[in-house]
């Protein structure tokens, strides 16, 4: 199998950008990542674009138009909280399988206000699943409580994860 390497990364500063489209936001991050490794848009052989909120809007294809690259395969990924990670994994897998040599993985989202970025309003996600919670944090909280009951995990141990994550975010000048 072919080796796969991450050769360029970047991200835009977290924030709200009401004057910009999701593809424009993703294009900025994509160009910054390409600049980081000295590649050009012409080097890209495929795009794996993670986006959940506007998933029906062909964000990947529109992102490519923004950066001036068309005519290459695009895979748009929507997988709840794992959307970006899934796009990255699929990009990696395409290289490992020998399908491509240079691919771009982008995760981009523009959340609205409200539950799940406003996507849980009328016709959206109100309640679902056995827990009837409708939000991933509530579902993860239930999973955590079950883990604690079954394994003796303490609230202090869960809190340490939050502290660790916050400490890591303080090292990122682009974090909120």
Segments the model singles out, each with a brief description of its role:
Residues 101-108:
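A short, small-residue-rich loop immediately preceding and capping a beta-strand
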């Amino acid at each position: 199998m072919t080796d796969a390497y991450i050769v360029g990364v970047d991200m835009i500063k977290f924030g709200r950008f009401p004057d910009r489209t999701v593809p424009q936001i993703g294009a900025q991050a994509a160009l910054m990542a390409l600049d980081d490794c000295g590649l050009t848009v012409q080097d890209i052989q495929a795009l794996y674009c993670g986006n959940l909120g506007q998933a029906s809007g062909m964000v990947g294809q529109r992102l490519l138009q923004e950066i001036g690259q068309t005519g290459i395969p695009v895979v748009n990924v929507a997988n709840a909280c794992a959307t970006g990670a899934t796009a990255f994994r699929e990009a990696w897998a395409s290289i490992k399988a020998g399908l491509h040599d240079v691919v771009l993985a982008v995760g981009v989202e523009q959340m609205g206000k409200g539950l799940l970025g406003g996507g849980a309003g009328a016709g959206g996600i109100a309640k679902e699943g056995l827990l009837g919670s409708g939000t991933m944090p509530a579902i993860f909280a239930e999973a955590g409580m079950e883990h604690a009951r079954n394994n003796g995990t303490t609230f202090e141990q869960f809190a340490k994860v939050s502290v660790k994550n916050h400490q890591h975010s303080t090292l990122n000048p682009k974090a909120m």
